[in-house]
């Protein structure tokens, strides 16, 4: 592990209102697990996504996994297409793999 916090860095670049929306959604998942598919969806191989609709009608995604019983945010992005880009999935899977090794 590198000690970097790429999701936190990404969030800090967003407008404050978007940060709050995404933060609330992550907290709902973290403290209300399990939650419904509208907010959280499995992506396979231990990877999940938090789905946030921002005020600007943009869609944000935070990809996460569990490590040592804790939810760990692995990658985040603004969704631009209906299907999650393979590159985004690969980044999250690699980070999850690095944590497990």
Where do the protein language model's features map onto the residues?
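Basic, Lys/Arg-enriched alpha-helical interface segments
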Residues: 1-59, 68-71, 78-101
